[in-house]
Amino acid sequence: MNPGEPADPAPVPLPEPKRLGTLARLAPEPMKVVLNWGRRYSLWVFNFGLACCAIEFIAASMARHDFIRLGVIPFAPGPRQADLMVVSGTVTDKMAPAVKRLYEQMPEPKYVISFGACSNCGGPYWDSYSVTKGVDQIIPVDVYVPGCPPRPEALLQGILKLQEKIARESLGERYGVSPRPSTAALQSGLVRPPEPEPEPEPEPEPEPGQGPGQGPGSGEGTDTGSDAGRGR
């Protein structure tokens, strides 16, 4: 740049645009409270039972504990109809892709409770080569319930903690740019499956009139013109 030429202007920093839904931008504060109240007491739960902690989840859903009185509806038909996933039991590297796939099929807003020591950090099998060291390596988790296995009362306490979190949520944070990491950004630490061996290519079939090993480039069975020169 010559001394007489003006310097280039410095770039102006612009704030990163945030995409908020129409409901998040236009709903007044009383309406946000009503929407949070509705989501808080209408959690349709999908139980991903992998080990003995799933039995405690079933016990919590029976008449003695009856978590339906807390607004939790058990046994959703599938992940596409569920609001809450409860991962109970040991998550292995082989099962981890299925857990992640079912989580991605759940509609927003969706929540996850890690139920039991095995789901939290691997539990007594943490040093096994095939055990995922916590389901939070695959999907984001909202509430951790410790225990091996936890009692049904511990799950009820975890549900109450999740409902308190939902009541404090902002629709702008939930439906806009969420601070929760995406499932693609999380490190899974899974064991890569072996790649299939390539299939051998089939050998070309010989043309009619050619024997095995005779081809257009083999030099056999072709007239090069040298025999005609010898007969002269």
From Swiss-Prot:
Origin superkingdom: Bacteria
Cofactor(s) in the UniProt record: [4Fe-4S] cluster
Gene Ontology cellular-component terms listed: plasma membrane; respiratory chain complex I
Biased composition (Gly residues): 210-222
Signal peptide positions on this chain: none
Cofactor note: Binds 1 [4Fe-4S] cluster.
Catalytic reaction list: a quinone + NADH + 5 H(+)(in) = a quinol + NAD(+) + 4 H(+)(out)
GO MF entries: 4 iron, 4 sulfur cluster binding; iron ion binding; NADH dehydrogenase (ubiquinone) activity; NADH:ubiquinone reductase (non-electrogenic) activity; quinone binding
EC number: 7.1.1.-
Residues binding [4Fe-4S] cluster, per UniProt: C52, C53, C118, C148
Topology in the lipid bilayer: Peripheral membrane protein
Translocase in keyword set: yes
UniProt region (Disordered), positions on chain: 173-232
Subunit structure as annotated in this protein's UniProt entry: NDH-1 is composed of 14 different subunits. Subunits NuoB, C, D, E, F, and G constitute the peripheral sector of the complex.
Function: NDH-1 shuttles electrons from NADH, via FMN and iron-sulfur (Fe-S) centers, to quinones in the respiratory chain. The immediate electron acceptor for the enzyme in this species is believed to be a menaquinone. Couples the redox reaction to proton translocation (for every two electrons transferred, four hydrogen ions are translocated across the cytoplasmic membrane), and thus conserves the redox energy in a proton gradient.
Record-stated family: Belongs to the complex I 20 kDa subunit family.
The protein's name: NADH-quinone oxidoreductase subunit B 2
Naturally occurring in which organism (per UniProt): Streptomyces coelicolor (strain ATCC BAA-471 / A3(2) / M145)
